[in-house]
Design a protein with these regions (language model features):
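NTP-handling and nucleic-acid-processing catalytic cores
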Residues: 4-19, 55, 141-367, 475-477, ...
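Conserved phosphate/anionic-ligand binding catalytic regions in large, soluble enzymes, centered on
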Residues: 247-269, 428, 434-435, 440, ...
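Alpha-helical recognition segments enriched in aromatics with Gly/Pro capping
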Residues: 313-336, 365, 485-623
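N-terminal catalytic cores of NTP/NDP-binding nucleotidyl/phosphoryl-transfer enzymes
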Residues: 31-102, 129-144, 251-252, 318-354, ...
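Glycine- and acidic
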Residues: 2-5, 44-53, 126-130, 333-341, ...
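Residue patterns forming the tRNA-binding/recognition surfaces of aminoacyl-tRNA synthetases
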Residues: 8, 16-17, 21-25, 97-254, ...
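Conserved oxyanion/phosphate-binding beta-strand-loop segments in alpha/beta enzyme cores
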Residues: 2-42, 72-81, 104-112, 217, ...
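Helix-rich, typically C-terminal accessory recognition domains appended to large enzymatic cores
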Residues: 150-151, 155-162, 419-448, 569-572, ...
Length: 815
């Protein structure tokens, strides 16, 4: 046999070789129907921008891929599909900018993305790829709409919505930042009244919130969702006008009712016209017109100066019997509670600010330790933990929590109050007045009304419009395609009209994980047997920026489909982990700063495996890190060291038959490294796993590495540097994929050192440390301690009166 001479590590040739080998052998293919130990490893499918993958994408995908590869080595049948979220305003706007139809642009972008994703070594099974723009996919998006429509969860109603003059479409509240569009930070968002389709997600507010308590999700993600759902426990209290109008208000603090000195209605409240006097009508109407043009997010802002006008009318405070003035103000929103509040300026900051501005009465009704009914209020005091009621006849002196229940019960007995739970969450507006999206499958007939498109007629295919530019009319460009929207009514056959709005792109991504296992099926959206086998998703990794929109909507759609009998589970993701953010040289990446990292450049220069490991080594995966060009060379040097060890082991094995035995110290370190790396990889602590492998490699270089030691190292490296590990595995004499070899064998007994360090104390003070054999008996350890010169200085030859002995840890000599 000819000697094989050591060679240098060439990442480009190694990676090209193994990507081709994986393709030929079907290494990354999963037996989806026949899997015995299914593990669905999901990563957030990307929007295929023209710019291609950015480093944030790669950071997210590689972290998820490492988890999938680790689970495969652990014996699972891992399903790691990928697809493309290609509908939506981003694609449409870019197409308009470059003058190319999105139907031409998107396939080119997807092709580039797919090439890049393969290049970085993802273990994706591309046979199950989905594209949201494919009619074979959005047929089922439309089917889901129809299921919710028939279940009463999809409704059309007129509503005040956020309208971006630049995007020329409706925005969700989450897309409005400080009153401006998130996509156009210099464009002020307007309010418009439009007929829109909504999914009634508010009906699921309670389970959406309650299920978070037991969800195995990143704590930060759960907190964001819980705050967005925003449960408030309180009471609905009725104020009556002299004319008999009942104005219900929601309050979380009925104990402060005696301090309610005025009422405030939202300008949109239906009773405003009824309670406004003729003297105040002109002022009130003008104010309502001004507020109607404001966006809801700005109105909610705590920093915004409060404005309002008096209606001229009064209502009766049900607790005091006093008449309180009725105002309207922009800081009260119709979409929360009842659209009316009882203002308690003594104990609410917004009410205090408004009362000071309008010179309205301010009364203390809760006093803390050292305060009484006459203690002045320099500012609102909303939270008084040990507060008791004052200026509240019949309840003075009661703790506020007790008074809260008592006042609610007393008013409930009179029919003037009832306990109520409110939520901050609003229904999901899915209508979009744009072109590039799935048409909403509804037909309007003058005779039959609103008619769902029959399922047999799905998909409602998006027509190929040459002119798809949006306008300011409040309707979609599809409203200009008369030959498309004019259709016979499915019920009566008369000429009818299609819905011309398209659905929100977040609906596309709210169910894509359900489609993956059945992506090759045209007869069902998701096969019942496959869905039961693979769902809920075992591991989902993505960005926290999707906590409110995508993740909330995906949970809602799954819950709705369960209630409608289509799936057997309520929660789609068994585990979710939010990854961190990558910055460049301490600064957030942006084109304007010129510090955007192009992954292709680094993969070309350093290789995909070096790039993968460097990204994972930047810092804790769930926090992110700072990308600095100087750091990546250290990872390359590490891989070069491993390569040299493998090459040396290969040539020595040829010469000596590979019969060498490793030292006990190296065996012990190998097992300790296996323990650390497998544990850290499972918990996504990738940076510390890599650090442990680096320590192990340094020890191997200082010792005599054998094939067993290097095989264990190669298996540990496989999730992180898959091409590199495959090549090392082959060079160590194996003919099958490293991904089929399993995790290295771990023996806890061999990870424990034979010797331990005893702390020796004299009278409770540390005087020395001794290295002794593990399991040393007490009498032997005490004798060794007494013989230690450092200890003898303090014992002066005396025998101890008492010995405190902790096996393998402590000898304390008490004289």
């Amino acid at each position: 046999m000819a000697d094989r001479r050591p060679s240098a590590y060439d990442p480009q040739s190694v990676e090209q070789k193994w990507q081709q080998r994986w393709e030929e052998r079907g290494t990354n293919r999963t037996d989806v129907p026949g899997a015995a130990r299914p593990f669905f490893n999901l990563m957030m499918f990307p929007y295929p921008s023209a710019e291609g993958l950015h480093v944030g994408n790669v950071f997210a995908f590689v972290g998820a891929d490492i988890q999938g590869r680790y689970q495969r080595l652990a014996g699972h049948d891992v399903f790691e599909p990928l697809g493309f979220d290609a509908f939506g305003i981003h694609s449409e706007n870019f197409a308009l900018k470059v003058g190319t139809h999105p139907a031409e642009l998107i396939p080119r972008n997807i092709e580039r993305f797919r090439m890049q994703l393969k290049r970085i070594g993802l273990m994706a099974d591309w046979r199950y790829e989905v594209q949201t723009t494919d009619p074979r996919y959005y047929r089922w998006t439309q089917w889901i709409f129809l299921q919710l429509f028939r279940g009463g969860l999809a409704v059309k109603r007129r509503a005040a919505v956020n309208w971006c003059p630049a995007c020329k479409t409706v925005l969700a509240n989450e897309q409005v930042i400080g009153g401006f569009c998130e996509r156009h930070p210099d464009v002020k968002v307007e309010q418009r009244m439009l007929d829109q389709w909504f999914f009634t997600i508010t009906r699921y507010a309670a389970p959406l919130l309650d299920n978070l308590e037991t969800a195995d999700w990143s704590h930060s993600t759960k907190t964001i969702q819980a705050n967005w759902i925003g449960r408030s426990e309180g009471a609905e209290v009725v104020f009556e006008t002299p004319g008999g109008k009942r104005i219900p208000v929601f309050t979380t603090r009925p104990d402060t009712l005696f301090g309610a000195t005025y009422l405030v209605l939202a300008p949109e409240h239906p009773l405003v016209s009824d309670v406004t006097t003729s003297e105040c009508r002109t002022v009130v109407n003008e104010y309502r017109r001004r507020v109607a043009a404001m966006d809801l997010v700005s109105r909610k802002s705590v920093e915004k100066a409060k404005t309002g006008v008096f209606t001229g009318s009064y209502a009766r405070n049900p607790a005091t019997g006093a008449s309180v003035p009725i105002w309207i103000a922009d800081y009260v929103l119709m979409e929360y509670g009842t659209g009316a509040i009882m203002a308690v300026p003594g104990h609410d900051e917004r009410d205090f600010e408004f009362a000071m501005q309008m010179k309205l009465p301010i009364v203390r009704v809760v006093a803390g330790p050292g305060q009484d009914a006459a203690t002045p209020l320099a500012a609102a005091e909303p939270d008084i933990p040990e507060g008791r009621l004052v200026n509240s006849p019949g309840y003075d002196g009661k703790p506020w929590e007790e008074a809260k229940r008592a006042i609610t019960a007393a008013l409930a007995a009179k029919g003037l109050a009832k306990p109520v739970t409110n939520y901050r969450l609003h229904d999901w507006c899915i209508s979009r007045q744009r072109y590039w999206g799935p048409p909403i499958p509804i037909i309007y007939c003058d005779t039959c009304g609103t008619v769902p498109v029959p399922e047999k007629d799905l998909p409602v295919v998006l027509p190929a419009l040459e002119d798809f530019r949006p306008d300011d009319s409040g309707v979609s460009p599809l409203a200009r395609a008369e030959s498309w929207y004019r259709v016979p009514c499915p019920k009566c056959g008369k000429l009818a009209r299609r819905e011309t709005d398209v659905s929100d792109t977040f609906l596309d991504s709210a169910w894509y994980f359900l489609r993956y296992p059945s992506a090759d099926r045209d007869d069902v959206p998701f096969d019942a047997t496959l869905t039961k086998k693979w769902l809920p998703v075992a591991s989902y990794i993505g960005g926290n920026e999707h906590a409110v929109l995508h993740l909330m909507y995906a949970r809602f759609i799954t819950m709705a489909l369960k209630d409608l009998g289509h799936v057997s589970f309520a929660e789609p993701f068994a585990r979710f982990r939010a990854h961190g953010t990558i910055v460049k040289d301490g600064a957030k990446m942006s084109k304007s700063r010129g510090n955007v990292v192009n992954p292709d450049q680094y993969v070309e220069q350093w290789g995909a495996d070096t790039f993968r490991m460097y990204l994972m080594f930047l810092g804790p995966y769930q926090e992110g890190g700072d990308f600095r060009d100087a750091g990546i060379s250290g990872i390359r040097r590490f891989l070069d060291k491993v390569w040299a060890l493998v090459e040396t082991a290969g040539t020595e094995a040829q010469a000596h038959g590979g019969t060498g035995k490793p030292s006990p110290e190296l065996v012990r370190m190998m097992h300790r490294t296996i323990q650390r790396v497998t544990s850290d990889t499972a918990s996504l602590d990738y940076n510390t796993a890599i650090a442990a492998m680096m320590e192990y490699v340094n020890a191997l270089r200082d010792g005599t590495p054998t094939r067993d030691l290097l095989e264990s190292l190669t298996l540990l490296l496989a999730p992180y540097a898959p091409h590199f590990a495959e090549e090392c595995w082959e060079r160590l004499g194996h003919t099958t994929s490293v991904m089929d070899a399993g995790l290295p064998r771990f023996d806890p007994a061999l990870a424990v050192a034979d010797e331990v360090e005893f702390v020796v104390q004299v009278g409770g003070k540390v005087r020395s440390r001794l290295t002794l054999a593990r399991g040393t008996p007490e009498e032997v350890a005490v004798a060794a301690a007494l013989a230690d010169p450092a200890v003898r200085k303090f014992t002066e030859g005396k025998q101890p009166n008492k010995v405190v002995f902790v096996p393998d840890r402590l000898v304390n000599l008490v004289l």
